[in-house]
Amino acid sequence: MEFAAILRWLGWCSFVHRLSDDVLEDSARSLWTVPDLFAVFTVSGQTSSALIEVKTSQDMLLKFKKSYLQRLHAYAELMTQPLLIAWRPRAVGFWILFDPRIAQPSTDESVEIDFALAAKNDLMSILAGDYFIVPNEGAGFRFEYERIGEKKPMADGYEAVFRVSDAYLHDAAGVRSDDVPDSIVWTILSALKDNQEVHEDGFVQSFVASGGMTRAQMVLRTAVGFSLKDEERIHWKAVGNNLNAVMSCDGLLHDAESRFGTFMSYIFHLQPVEIPSFLPAGWRGRSAKGKATGETPATGSTKHVDG
């Protein structure tokens, strides 16, 4: 349900349906395996659909038995639909979408896809509308604490009572910013590093953007999961059924574009090394808007980053 909810939030998936393998027993059933999802994508009046098998893994390598993939492909051919694999390695925390035909032989009976191969062929941007964001390094939150009362010496330092004297959000130049949309806050929170400055009468704790890259889908995960306790899980079905309660993916993109230079450095729309043949002719995905890609694109064309 997590992947389906993320597809709907990204905005280009106009319909997603969870399929079931619960059918009457039949000898022909051994020929097919029903994938997890059927999804329809619509962009600028063009429509594309696909069957999607959803997988997660602890490590950065995904393996399939050849017979299993053959049954998935057989069902897809029966339905005259392309077959895709959605994969989330738990170590990285985001979803990749790819055609399983890129898999490499592992043994006589199995194939495998490593993270690098999957990332180069990722369709989440061009098909589903995901994009990469690089928050401006140094933008973030600053908490200033002042000591009240005397210090009590301890074996490895001292103990004292502090209180917050100031707290605010600031841009990459350190300028205090009070009118910042929630979407920018969630974006920064999805790519943080922690800094501390300690002095005699207090200390400063800052949570600032590291300069690393995040993705729209990870900003969503941060927004809906930030207030949960460690043992709590995100209720993705509720998220998918109540998208109006969450910032929109297009709204996040607009807010990021409008704060270029202060809070944002780059926005990338990823293009796979090979455009899938099942996509309609002229399918280009999300259009870039000026310097939101880090440069002014000629004739308004989309800036892509090849995997």
Segments (PLM) and residue ranges:
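Acidic-basic catalytic patches of nuclease active cores, encompassing PD-(D/E)XK
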Residues: M1-V23, L78, A128-E144
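Active-site metal-binding core of divalent-cation-utilizing nuclease and nuclease-like domains
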Residues: H17-G45, E146-G149
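Mg2+/Mn2+-dependent nuclease catalytic core
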Residues: T56-Q81
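Hydrophobic, glycine-enriched assembly/anchoring segments
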Residues: L253-G307
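Conserved catalytic cores of phosphodiester-cleaving nucleases, focusing on short active-site segments
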Residues: L7, P35-D59
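Short, surface-exposed beta-strand-loop junctions and turns on beta-sheet-rich folds
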Residues: E2, Q58-D59, Q104
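Nucleic-acid nuclease catalytic cores
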Residues: H73-A103
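Long, charge-rich C-terminal accessory regions
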Residues: F98-P276
